[in-house]
C-alpha cells in the first residue's frame, strides 16, 4: 500500500510540473489517503503483535 501511495505521489509531482492541476490534485488526494491508511494499519499491527 505504501508502494501505491509513492506511485501516486510521483504522478502528482509530474502532473504538477507539467501544469495539469486537476490530475495533480486528484493524485495527491489518492496518495494522501493511501498513506494515512498505511500508517493506521502499521500502528494497529504493531500493537497486535504478540510478545517475542
Swiss-Prot record:
Keyword Membrane recorded: yes
Subcellular location(s) per record: Cell membrane
Main location: membrane
Sequence intervals crossing the membrane: 5-25, 27-47
Keywords recorded for this protein, A-Z: Cell membrane, Membrane, Transmembrane, Transmembrane helix
Membrane topology: Multi-pass membrane protein
Source superkingdom: Bacteria
GO cellular component: plasma membrane
Annotated family: Belongs to the UPF0391 family.
Name assigned to this protein: UPF0391 membrane protein XOO4217
Species in which this protein is naturally found: Xanthomonas oryzae pv. oryzae (strain KACC10331 / KXO85)
Amino acid at each position: 500500500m505504501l508502494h501505491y501511495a509513492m506511485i501516486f505521489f510521483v504522478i502528482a509531482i509530474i502532473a504538477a510540473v507539467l501544469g495539469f492541476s486537476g490530475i495533480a490534485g486528484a493524485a495527491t488526494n489518492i496518495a494522501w489517503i493511501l498513506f494515512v491508511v498505511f500508517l493506521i494499519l502499521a500502528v494497529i499491527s504493531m500493537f497486535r503483535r504478540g510478545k517475542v
